[in-house]
């Protein structure tokens, strides 16, 4: 960890605990700050808050009182999930108090360079692929962010010869000031999180913060097939490395003659890749670009792609029952992810979909229903998905209350050779704490059929 003195004796407000807030507060105390921790959950129900209080921190729970800002606060470190419309953050901005997320703290203390990966879909798969390729290439990667360990915990132990590989959400990237990844990858942009950002434009600008501090000594890995991402890459001063699944890229990554190329050099045959889905070729090209920029050999990249079958809850194969294959794609929290999941299969498919209602309709899914023989909907968005399915002309449409019921109904509507796919196209928070919990419950329900 770098020697950092900028936080010594400063009053710093950590807003929202959870894993990232707990880690940030603990780090800041270690760096000599006077830490004030604030969380909306009452102290009696807040185990992490009680632990921080036991460490001698000033802990205020049960709301976000504006009076906290009267304590000569130098910096606010916010949980990514707390919107900037929260009154205490509005007041902090008015007082010109800097507001950051813990990823910013991680960057400031890290001896190791960062690779940052963002996009609406594919972040986790690309991050894991990048990590595996760098590991195979003996580049000493450590993984942090939305997957793995909280970034500022990883950064404390990261050495100069290591690489911190981190998946970054728009929520995290809104709170960066100095964060400067050596390599920044922007995979795609799809209309999402509008309840947080308001518009797709604001959402895209938040993600483009990944480029904010890059210089000509850094690299920006850009999806050349996404017009929005290409437009936002104008914010980067780094060296742009493009990737495409649809056209040849001489100075980047592309697919040609059934092989993946980087800077006109063949890296791996498509037939050697075991990860399913056309959309995953985009993720692979992005990860391959990062790996090649960091000096990983073609042999190491090929070795990873010959064994990497995917990430849990992302088109995860579950089991086969009576020649019906079950797939868990609970991470599909928006329509684009579900479109890509449906495009990955040519077999007749029974789709399970539904979840938190964020105000959007689902007509964009209709062209992707060509192989869908039945749909079972659940959650807040069930009526909207039913409407889209009716417009698509699906004959078998059901709505149920629970995911367990949905699995039973989906199996009942399937026949020999079908795919049964959970790809909700929605966030999970109407019925589940996380998409992981939703996926685990799906898997449990599937195994009950055996």
Swiss-Prot record:
Gene3D superfamilies in the record: Mur ligase, C-terminal domain, Mur-like, catalytic domain, NAD(P)-binding Rossmann-like Domain
Pathway linked to the protein: Cell wall biogenesis; peptidoglycan biosynthesis
Record organism: Bacillus thuringiensis (strain Al Hakam)
Cell cycle listed as a keyword: yes
Catalyzed reaction equations: UDP-N-acetyl-alpha-D-muramoyl-L-alanine + D-glutamate + ATP = UDP-N-acetyl-alpha-D-muramoyl-L-alanyl-D-glutamate + ADP + phosphate + H(+)
Task of the protein: Cell wall formation. Catalyzes the addition of glutamate to the nucleotide precursor UDP-N-acetylmuramoyl-L-alanine (UMA).
Source organism, top-level taxon: Bacteria
UniProt-listed GO biological process terms: cell division; cell wall organization; peptidoglycan biosynthetic process; regulation of cell shape
Protein localization: Cytoplasm
Pfam families: Mur_ligase_C, Mur_ligase_M, MurD-like_N
Keyword DNA-binding in annotation: no
SUPFAM superfamilies: MurCD N-terminal domain (SSF51984), MurD-like peptide ligases, catalytic domain (SSF53623), MurD-like peptide ligases, peptide-binding domain (SSF53244)
Protein name: UDP-N-acetylmuramoylalanine--D-glutamate ligase
Sequence similarity: Belongs to the MurCDEF family.
Cellular component, GO, one term: cytoplasm
InterPro entries, per the entry: Mur-like_cat_sf, Mur_ligase_C, Mur_ligase_C_dom_sf, Mur_ligase_cen, MurD
Cysteine-cysteine disulfides: none
Keywords: ATP-binding, Cell cycle, Cell division, Cell shape, Cell wall biogenesis/degradation, Cytoplasm, Ligase, Nucleotide-binding, Peptidoglycan synthesis
Annotated positions binding ATP: 119-125
MF annotations from Gene Ontology: ATP binding; UDP-N-acetylmuramoylalanine-D-glutamate ligase activity
E.C. numbers: 6.3.2.9
């Amino acid at each position: 960890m770098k020697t950092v003195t900028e936080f010594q004796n400063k009053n710093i407000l950590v807003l929202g605990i959870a894993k990232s807030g707990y880690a940030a507060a603990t780090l800041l105390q270690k760096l000599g700050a006077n830490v004030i921790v604030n969380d909306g959950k009452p102290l009696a129900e807040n185990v992490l808050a009680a632990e921080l209080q036991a460490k001698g921190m000033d802990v205020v729970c049960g709301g976000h009182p504006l009076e906290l800002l009267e304590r000569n606060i130098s910096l606010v470190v916010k949980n990514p999930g707390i919107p900037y419309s929260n009154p205490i953050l509005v007041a902090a901005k008015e007082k010109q108090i800097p507001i950051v997320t813990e990823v910013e703290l991680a960057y400031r203390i890290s001896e190791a360079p960062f690779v940052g990966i963002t996009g609406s879909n594919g972040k986790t798969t690309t991050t894991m692929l990048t990590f595996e390729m760098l590991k195979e290439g003996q580049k000493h990667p450590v993984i942090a962010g939305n997957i793995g360990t909280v970034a500022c915990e990883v950064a404390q132990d990261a050495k100069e010869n290591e690489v911190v590989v981190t998946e970054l959400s728009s929520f995290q990237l809104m709170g960066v000031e100095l964060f400067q990844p050596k390599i920044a990858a922007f995979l795609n942009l799809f209309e999402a999180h509008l309840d947080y950002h308001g518009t797709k434009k604001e959402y895209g600008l938040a993600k483009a913060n990944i480029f904010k501090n890059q210089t000509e000594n850094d690299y920006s890995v850009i999806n050349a097939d996404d017009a929005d991402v290409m437009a936002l890459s104008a914010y980067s001063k780094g060296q742009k490395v493009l990737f495409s699944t649809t056209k040849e890229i001489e100075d980047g990554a592309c697919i040609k003659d059934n092989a993946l190329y980087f800077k006109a050099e063949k890296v791996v045959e498509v037939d050697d890749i075991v990860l399913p889905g056309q959309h995953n070729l985009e993720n692979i090209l992005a990860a391959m670009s990062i790996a090649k920029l960091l000096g990983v050999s073609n042999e190491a990249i090929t070795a990873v792609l010959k064994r990497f079958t995917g990430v849990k809850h992302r088109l995860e194969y579950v089991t086969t029952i009576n020649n019906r294959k079950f797939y868990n794609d609970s991470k599909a929290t928006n329509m684009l992810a579900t479109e890509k999941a449906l495009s990955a299969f040519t077999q007749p498919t029974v789709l399970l979909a539904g979840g938190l209602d964020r105000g959007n309709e689902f007509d964009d899914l209709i062209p992707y229903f060509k192989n869908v023989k039945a749909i079972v909907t659940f959650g807040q968005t069930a009526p909207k998905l039913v409407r889209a399915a009716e417009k698509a002309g699906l004959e078998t449409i059901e709505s149920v209350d629970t995911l367990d019921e949905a699995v039973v109904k989906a199996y009942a509507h399937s026949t020999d050779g079908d795919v049964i796919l959970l790809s909700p196209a929605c966030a999970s928070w109407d019925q589940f704490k996380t998409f992981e919990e939703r996926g685990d419950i799906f898997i449990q329900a599937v195994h009950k059929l055996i």
